[in-house]
């Protein structure tokens, strides 16, 4: 595939995923999880798409998204992408969109404190703001890791519980 088609592939991924994506997510989707582009080419073409205003950086976020010009460009030239790749991208987006949305919306990290305890930071973000940030100090690393691993699956449930409890 030539560089123009590879750039169209990236635009097609944005359109089909229908959510803003981090650069790391685009690189994973296009080159690690699928073999649509090489990592280095994907990184270069993504940067070029931003430079030419076909993709933009979402304000107050690490995410990127397709611009209206990018949508127009894709509408004119998407047929240049081989239909087999378009079908793969469409199926991949349908099957994985929510997984990536959760991964980007629900942030969690932990760090060791001077006294040997751990602070776990859990966040729920939307496209441009943090909806909730929760910090908890736990006794040891295993508890911090457990919370870290549980956060993506339990974030919305935790938010709803806190919201309902505080507003009762």
Segment roles from a protein language model:
Residues 8-12, 28, 32, 47:
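Contiguous, well-ordered alpha-helical segments that form the cores/surfaces of helical PPI scaffolds
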Residues 71-90:
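Glycine-rich, Lys/Arg-enriched anion-binding loops that position phosphate/diphosphate groups
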């Amino acid at each position: 595939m030539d560089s123009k088609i590879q750039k169209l592939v990236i635009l097609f991924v944005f359109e089909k995923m229908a959510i803003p994506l981090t650069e790391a997510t685009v690189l994973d989707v296009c080159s690690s999880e699928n073999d649509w582009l090489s990592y280095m080419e994907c990184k270069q073409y993504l940067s070029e798409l931003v430079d030419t205003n076909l993709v933009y950086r979402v304000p107050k976020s690490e995410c990127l998204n397709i611009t209206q010009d990018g949508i127009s460009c894709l509408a004119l030239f998407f047929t240049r992408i081989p239909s087999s790749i378009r079908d793969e991208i469409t199926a991949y987006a349908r099957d994985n969109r929510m997984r990536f949305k959760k991964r980007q919306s629900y942030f969690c990290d932990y760090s060791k404190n001077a006294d040997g305890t751990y602070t776990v930071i859990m966040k729920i973000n939307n496209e441009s703001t943090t909806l909730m940030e929760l910090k908890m100090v736990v006794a040891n690393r295993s508890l911090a890791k457990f919370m870290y691993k549980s956060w993506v699956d339990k974030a919305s449930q935790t938010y709803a519980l806190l919201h309902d409890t505080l507003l009762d």
